Amino acid sequence: NEKEVCLSMALKLGALIKERYPDIKIIYTRSTDVFVELAERANIANRNNADLFICIHANAGSTTAYGSETYVLGLHRTDAQQKVAERENASIALEDDKGAKYRSYDLTPDGIIALQFQLAVFHRQSILFAEMIQKEFKRIGRYDRGVKQAGFLVLYKTTMPSVLIETAFLPNPTEEKLIGTAEGQQKMALA
């Protein structure tokens, strides 16, 4: 189950960071298996004046897809990026108000100008961090699918450098086995 695997990896990553850098304050959007709305995930980081937002996911796709990729906020530039953003943003349907709070997420020409302004503030820092993540995935033997851009709502709402990490492809049995074990999750967290 993606949400349980990703929660486990996030908690393992947080513990590793705390162990290596005890002065860093770790703030989780959730520490138990509960659903947190997309806007609230970003709001938690914003309210706590976070310096960095990391969102951990497991990818969907074909049973033969493999590797790790990291996303930063960007405009939908291709059909493939649009589909990925739609899939990640689909959890809006699970929210009580079915997305009424996201009406400000606007990709009209005016919305795009506003989004470009927001992108300029933290975009470069997000890309640099995403590149470091991908380098670490490569170091542990993961196939590097690269740093990509998409209009994920959870990244759009943050006011700090932010990344969404797609750790592995759940439909691929080998990838599912990797992140489905405590050992595999620890390996991913160490990256």
Residue ranges of model-derived segments:
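Flexible hinge/switch segments at interdomain interfaces of large molecular machines
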Residues: K101-P109, L164
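Active-site-adjacent mobile loop/cap segments within catalytic or ligand-binding domains
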Residues: A58, G111-A191
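Catalytic-core regions of hydrolytic enzymes
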Residues: N1-S104, L119-E131, Q186
